[in-house]
């Protein structure tokens, strides 16, 4: 008997992007019982690539079926029609910002007459986004990545039949603690020195990540250290310093903080290298003014690395008093664009950031993280839990799907 097929739309699962990594885990889990087709953002639009053999090896499923249909962005209605017609899809799974799928939601009546839509969704902050109500109602099921997302969706579409809290999960076989000897060696190899205190930020260089506030906050902390202690601290930022939609990090450091010990890692790295980076860090920080979830800090927890977070969005879900320093927002205001008319932004003050860094710096050797695995498991923050929950939701979605009745117009005389 032939398996049912799932069409996944999002970043190419072979690319090391945040969405790509998550969709890879989900799709490999689903491939155990479904045939998978991905409309893969970032591929040439003429490409159709069969990766069934490599998926079979990865999952030990000799019957795996997995094809990639290329798209330069996030697909089109014509491409989806072609894929559904060719592959006979049983469900569609989408993941990324809702505005990427305007073309899909505008044609939801047509698409949902053929198969249901599952949206793995995150929203950064209040107010409840009423302008997304038509999008939420266009989906047959919505998996909410944070508790705040779940709160937003359920308050916008109060009678939606299937909205479930389904947090991101970390693969603890890819992100795990290393021993002190390896950490010391990695610091020497990667940083050029076995620093006593490494503050690490892994973030895309876009405005909401507030990297300029981070540098200012680190400066507040650094200037209060003794001359001797200054020699043994460093801020490591993994980002693109010249990203067109971000801040000019090089100019900020050259002109404003030329004496500040900051290292930039600007090359895309695979998960084993990222695991090294979390482990060599004394602390991982995320003070974004909008953050739907914040994978970097949860990945850090999986390596037994303490975290500093802004008390906003999905970062709230990750707070554990044993190993988290929380920076409370100093200002909350409304900002927006044409696509996102309104959303709260929670800004932290550099002095508060500096104070939190200093607090963790002083207590770092006394922090105990022996219960980190229990924390991940109890909060469903493991990749296994994420994939299992989404797989169950897809099963239920397909089982309960009923094709809408088609109406026929007759001439009335």
What residues fall within each predicted segment?
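Aromatic "clamp/platform" in nucleotide-sugar-dependent glycosyltransferases that forms part
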Residues: 289
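N-terminal subdomain of nucleotide-sugar transferases
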Residues: 1-53, 87, 387, 411-413
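A charged, aromatic-enriched C-terminal amphipathic alpha-helix characteristic of glycosyltransferases
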Residues: 346-352, 362-392
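Acidic anion/phosphate-binding donor-loop and adjacent secondary structure
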Residues: 129-131, 154, 170-185, 195
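Short hydrophobic beta-strand element within catalytic cores of glycosyltransferases
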Residues: 306-309, 319, 325-326
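Carbohydrate-associated surface elements
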Residues: 148, 169
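Conserved donor-binding/catalytic core segment of Leloir-type glycosyltransferases
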Residues: 7-8, 193-209, 215-218, 235-237
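Nucleotide-activated donor-binding/catalytic signature segment of Leloir-type glycosyltransferases, i.e.
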Residues: 110, 246-272
